Curated annotation (Swiss-Prot):
Biased amino acid composition, Basic and acidic residues: 1-17
Enzyme Commission numbers on file: 2.1.1.319
Protein name: Probable protein arginine N-methyltransferase 3
Function of the molecule: Protein-arginine N-methyltransferase that catalyzes both the monomethylation and asymmetric dimethylation of the guanidino nitrogens of arginine residues in target proteins, and therefore falls into the group of type I methyltransferases.
Organism the protein comes from: Oryza sativa subsp. indica
Binding site for S-adenosyl-L-homocysteine: 275, 299, 321, 323, 364
Zinc finger (C2H2-type): 55-78, 110-137
Composition skew (Acidic residues), residue ranges: 18-45
Active site: 383, 392
Protein family (similarity comment): Belongs to the class I-like SAM-binding methyltransferase superfamily. Protein arginine N-methyltransferase family.
C-alpha cells in the first residue's frame, strides 16, 4: 500500500528528522538528529502539541505532538474519550491497538464507530459523533478481532506513542542516562535499541525472540551496564508483537494467495463441472437478479464468475483477488473477451459488455483501492468454499464484503451452506488394498497406514457404497445473515446403520466419519433457476472430494432388531453398537486460514449401555 501524503515515514516520526534533510541524505546531520531523536522517543511526546505534530487525529485531519493532547482533542471535539473506553472495557495494550485501528477503519468509511450509522462525508460524521456508547456484539466489543492488530494506516505513529500502560518515565537501566552516556561496542545503546526495534517491526516474531534474549551490554567506559532487552519498554515489545502477529497473518495470506497463482489449481477448479456449472447456471439462469446489477466478485481467480455475471447482463462488475499474478491473468482474460472496463475510453466508444474491473486487493481493503459505489453492490458472488467447507477460512472475507459492500437486501451467491456427516466402512480405508497385493498379504502396512490416518484428516473421494450409516446434518449456515463467530461451532448428532450398510453377517464395522457439504443458490435470490452444488459421495465427484476422519479403532454396528444383547464391550463383534453418538467441534485454528476439528464418539448398545472412546483432535 502506498504511503499516504499526510503520513510521515517512521524514521522521521521517531527521530524527529526534517523531511527534506532526510530525503537529501545529509548523513552528518542525521547522526546528530538520531541521538537527539532518541530522547524524543524516550519522552514519548510529553510536550503538548498543536496541529503540526506527527500524531493524526482518529476523526479529522488535526495533528498533535503527544498522545495526551490528541486524545484530549478527541474527547472534547469528537466525544471519544479513549481513556474512559480503556477503563470501562478493561482492555490490555493489544486491545488499545485494535481499538485505534478499528476506529480509523470506521472513520475511513464515514461510519460512526459506536452506533454504525453511515454518512456521506467526514464533516457529517464529525457533526454526528455523540456521547460515549461502547458497542457490544453478543457480549464482545466489535474491535476484538485480531484483524485490527494490523495498522489501518501505514506507519501510524500513534501506535508507537501509546503510553497508557507505561509504568514509569525513567529509562530501564535503573538510573538517569545522559545522551550518549552508555555504549555498546562501537555504537550507542540508543542506536542499537533503535535498530533492533526497527528490525522487530520489519522482520516479525523471530526477531522478537532475539530481541528478548539479547545479551547484556557492557560499557567500555564503565558508565552503565544493563540488559539490552530491558532498555526498550514493554510497550515497544508489545507493539512489535502486535505487528508481528499482523505480519504473521499477512505471511499466511501471501502464501495462500501465492498458492492460487498456479494455473494447475485453476485448471482443476474450472474443469470441475459440478462447481463451475452451478455458478454458471445461477448467474445466467436468473435474469431478474442479474440484468443491470452491480456485482462484486470476491476471490475472482481467472475471472470466470465475473465473465458469467457480465454475460448475464450486469451493468458493473468489480472482481477482487489477493494474488497479483491472478489479477494480471484475469485482466488479460477479461480484455481478450471484450468485457474489460476502460475508464479512459470515451463513453460512446464503450460496448455494453465492457463492465469488469479487476482489482488487486483483499476484500477487507477494497475501499482503500477503489471508490466503492455509493449505493453499494446488488450482488456479491464468491466461490469461497474449502475442504470440509471451512478450510482456508475465506468465508470471513466474504462476510466482511457482505457487511460493508452489499446493499441492504442484496443477494449473496451462494446464500446457504450445509455440512453433512456419515460413517464409512472398511472400503473407505486402504486396508483392502494392502490385504492382497498381487496375492501377498501386506495388511501389516495397511494397519500402520490406517493408524496414521487416525491422526490426520484425509481429503479423498469415497464411493457411495462405502458409506455404511444414515446421513446426519452437522450445521447449516444462512450466508445472508450469519455472523463471523458462527464459523466456529459444535454439533451433536447420531448415526445409525443404513439399510445399504448392513453386511451379510449382520455386523458392519464403521471405521470413521466422513464430512461433505452442499451450497445452495436458493429461490430467495435465484427465483427463476435455483441451483444446488453438492460435494456428496452420492453425487458426481468434485475437486473438494470429501474429508475423512478415521477412528482410532473401528466400531462394530448392527441394526437394532438384529443386535445381540451381551455383556461384552460395546462396539465389538460380540456386542455391536446400534447407534454412534458423536460430537464434532470445528473452530478456526491459531494458524491463520486453518481449522481444528475435535471428534467425541460414544457407542450405544441395544440395551442402552454406552462406551466412549478418547477424543480425537485433527488439524486441517
Amino acid at each position: 500500500m502506498a504511503t499516504r501524503e499526510h503520513e510521515l515515514r517512521p524514521e522521521q516520526e521517531r527521530l524527529g528528522e526534517d523531511r527534506e534533510e532526510y530525503e537529501d541524505g545529509e548523513e552528518e546531520e542525521e547522526e546528530e538528529e538520531e541521538e537527539e531523536g532518541w530522547d524524543d522517543w524516550e519522552s514519548d511526546g510529553d510536550d503538548a502539541g498543536g496541529g503540526g505534530g506527527g500524531l493524526l487525529c482518529l476523526f479529522c485531519s488535526a495533528r498533535f505532538d503527544s498522545e495526551s493532547s490528541l486524545f484530549s482533542h478527541c474527547a472534547s471535539e469528537h466525544r471519544f474519550d479513549f481513556y474512559r473506553v480503556v477503563k470501562e472495557t478493561g482492555m490490555d495494550f493489544y486491545g488499545c491497538i485494535k481499538l485505534i485501528n478499528f476506529v480509523r477503519s470506521k472513520v475511513a468509511e464515514n461510519k460512526c464507530w459506536s452506533c454504525g450509522q453511515v454518512f456521506s462525508s467526514n464533516s457529517e460524521l464529525c457533526g454526528h459523533l455523540h456521547a460515549l456508547e461502547i458497542p457490544q456484539l453478543e457480549g464482545k466489543v466489535p474491535w476484538g478481532d485480531d484483524v485490527y492488530l494490523k495498522p489501518f494506516l501505514e506507519d501510524d505513529s500513534l501506535l508507537h506513542s501509546l503510553s497508557v500502560f507505561d509504568d514509569d518515565d525513567e529509562d530501564d537501566c535503573g538510573m538517569p542516562m545522559e545522551k550518549g552516556g552508555c555504549s555498546a561496542g562501537n555504537g550507542s545503546l540508543a542506536e542499537t535499541c533503535e535498530s533492533n526495534l526497527k528490525s522487530i517491526i520489519n522482520d516479525g516474531s523471530d526477531v522478537i525472540d532475539r530481541f528478548e534474549r539479547t545479551c547484556t551490554i557492557e560499557s567500555t567506559d564503565g558508565e552503565c551496564s544493563g540488559s539490552l532487552a530491558q532498555e526498550p519498554s514493554d510497550k515497544q515489545l508489545k507493539i512489535a508483537r502486535a505487528s508481528a502477529a499482523a505480519r504473521g497473518i499477512n505471511s499466511v495470506d501471501e502464501s495462500y494467495f501465492g498458492s492460487y497463482s498456479s494455473f494447475g489449481i485453476h485448471r482443476e477448479m474450472l474443469g470441475d463441472k459440478v462447481r463451475t456449472e452451478a455458478y454458471r447456471d445461477a448467474l445466467l439462469g436468473n435474469p431478474s437478479l442479474m440484468n443491470g446489477a452491480t456485482v462484486l466478485d470476491v476471490g475472482c481467480g481467472t475471472g470466470i464468475l465475473s465473465l458469467f455475471a457480465a454475460k448475464a447482463g450486469a451493468s458493473r462488475v468489480i472482481a477482487v483477488d489477493g494474488s497479483a499474478k491472478m489479477v494480471s491473468v484475469a485482466t488479460e482474460v477479461t480484455k481478450s473477451n471484450g468485457f474489460l472496463y476502460d475508464e479512459n475510453m470515451e463513453m460512446q466508444q464503450k460496448r455494453d459488455t465492457q463492465v469488469i474491473t479487476v482489482v488487486h486487493t483483499k476484500a477487507e481493503e477494497l475501499n482503500h483501492k477503489i471508490q466503492v459505489p455509493s449505493n453499494k453492490f446488488d450482488v456479491l458472488v464468491s466461490e469461497w468454499m474449502g475442504y470440509c467447507l471451512l478450510y482456508e477460512s475465506m468465508l470471513s472475507s466474504v462476510l466482511y464484503a457482505r457487511d460493508h459492500f452489499l446493499k441492504p437486501g442484496g443477494a449473496i451467491l451462494p446464500d446457504t451452506a450445509t455440512i453433512f456427516g456419515a460413517g464409512f466402512g472398511k472400503g473407505g480405508t486402504s486396508l483392502p488394498f494392502w490385504e492382497n497385493v498381487y496375492g501377498f498379504d501386506m495388511s501389516c502396512i495397511g494397519k500402520e497406514v490406517t493408524g496414521n490416518s487416525a491422526r490426520f484428516p484425509v481429503v479423498d473421494i469415497l464411493a457411495s457404497e462405502d458409506i455404511v450409516t444414515e446421513t446426519a446434518v452437522l450445521n447449516s449456515f444462512d450466508l445472508a445473515t450469519m455472523k463471523e463467530n458462527e464459523m466456529d461451532f459444535t454439533s451433536s448428532f447420531e448415526l445409525r446403520l443404513s439399510e445399504s450398510g448392513v453386511s451379510p453377517s449382520g455386523v458392519t464395522w464403521c471405521y470413521g466419519i466422513i464430512l461433505w457439504f452442499d451450497t445452495g443458490f436458493t429461490n430467495r435470490f435465484c427465483k427463476e433457476k435455483p441451483v444446488n452444488l453438492s460435494t456428496s459421495p452420492f453425487s458426481t465427484p468434485t475437486h473438494w472430494s470429501q474429508t475423512i476422519f478415521t477412528f482410532e479403532e473401528p466400531i462394530a454396528m448392527a441394526k437394532e432388531e438384529s443386535a445381540v444383547v451381551s455383556s461384552a464391550s460395546v462396539g465389538t463383534d460380540e456386542c455391536p453398537a446400534v447407534m454412534i453418538r458423536s460430537r464434532i467441534s470445528i473452530v478456526r485454528a491459531s494458524e491463520h486460514r486453518s481449522i481444528d476439528i475435535s471428534i467425541e464418539t460414544t457407542g450405544i448398545s441395544s440395551d442402552g449401555r454406552k462406551r466412549s472412546w478418547p477424543v480425537q483432535i485433527f488439524n486441517l
